[in-house]
Amino acid sequence: MKKFILMLFMLFMVLMMMNCDSKIKQTEQMAQAFIDSLTNVIKPLNKAANLAYWEATASGKDEYYERYAGASLELATVYANSADFEKLKTLKSSKIKDPLLARQIEILYYRFLAKQIDTTLLKQITEMQTAVEARFNKFRGKIDGRAVTGNDIKEILVSSNDLTLRKKAWEASKQVAPAVEKDMLALVHLRNEAARKLGFNNFQQMSLITDEQDPTEVERIFQELDAATREPFRHDKAMMDSILSKRFNIKPEELRPWHYADPFFQDVPAVSAVNLDQYYQNQNVVKIAESFYAGIGLGVSPVLANSDLYERPGKYPHAYCTDIDREGDVRIMVNVRNNEEWMATVLHELGHAVYSSNIDRQLPYFLREEAHLFTTEAIAMFFEKLSKNPTWMRAMLNLDAEEEADIREATAQMLRLQKLIFARWSLVMYNFEKSLYENPEQDLNKLWWDLVEQYQMIKRPENRNQPDWASKIHVCSYPVYYHNYQLGELLAAQLTEAIARYQGVNDGAKIKYVNNPDLGNYLKTNIFSVGRKYRWDEMIVRATGEKLTAKYFVEQL
């Protein structure tokens, strides 16, 4: 009798499991059909929006910005569909076993969550952001009545010893701010309104959470970054200030923002007798980059054939990379001049491009993206630094051994300073945006300069009360994005360590970069090809053997 009861129980359990598996299979079939229907709608809209943005930034024409706004709104309206969001919520809580299916649902859930607001508010946000961005991109500051480009301003700040001209150039870089401040602030309020309607404290918190980042963890990382870099930066900035004050024949305490090499002090000022521009000025930096990437098995010729490489009136004055269709149409928008900065920028943007181009196209559409925004920034930064790598420069620029030796010490110093300077600048941006969305009614002009003085240790200009914060395009066009650049720096350092181990060398400086297809293969296999198949944190462990850490960034300073 006991055996009979036991057999009945086992039969019951088997039937239950079969029924459960059948239900899961039915749910998975329903989920796949739902995702297929979303793909059919979202895929062409994404492509249309990307193409419109490309044409807008290439030409500066209002008609393309309007087309971009329309396509973006149409796309946002799809994500705002409440019935579809409810389906995603149900599917997310179901026990789907297929990992690719479950991952797509997770990604779509957060994408829809961020848009669950009424269409009127959605329309306001989309149209205002596009209008402000168009104004920003077409604006050119003036020096003594003459319109100047961003490149013109940078050249003055890098090379001129005329203090009056330097100040005028710096002020020209800020002239866009009053033209966009009012609408940018209105945009902040609209973004916060949307976030609060969804149950978040503010837009910054919502942006992190819906992008699979923990606000508490991000805050912890940036506090640690501040503590780890504060004294090294203070020491090195005193050295830089001593050199700059002698160059300009003023006291160190008289240095102001226009005495540095970039309008925001993002870049290393000219504190070395070595000027790397001399090695690039008679070269073609685009061809150098093309040759380099081909040598590591990550060809970029198709990317460059579709790209927009040189500056002209009305064109977007900065740089970006875009994946138009997730099917191979990847492009970069740059404004190249043959100098070290643009060598770095072209390497950076093509770093994004080789990532996007080498994602496995057999993956479902919604997984054909980078694992995270900061993982593609990490790759871009990993390659960007090669413009200051003496071994790489010798190979790519045909320098002789003596020339390589001449720049080795200077480039090592530049790379250290670059890391420190950017870390402190990223602290300004992270803390400004965090505070901006927490309290947009505060005195933002004062907040901006308080943070610049605290983290970058630059004195604010006397008697200046201008919305200088609004001259940074990221606040409008790429909100709550800047922290990803610094997280990318941390991952780039961790990746350098992992690749050194992979190549069997004990120092990242000994990594073989040039004509090494094995390097490209490592990146394709471990990072690029998997796309967004895994969450960013799982991908990093798989690729490097450990969780994201600031350890290697600090060690490599």
Regions found by a protein language model. Give the residues of each.
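Active-site-proximal, well-structured secondary-structure segments within enzyme catalytic domains
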Residues: 145-151, 159, 185-333, 403-412, ...
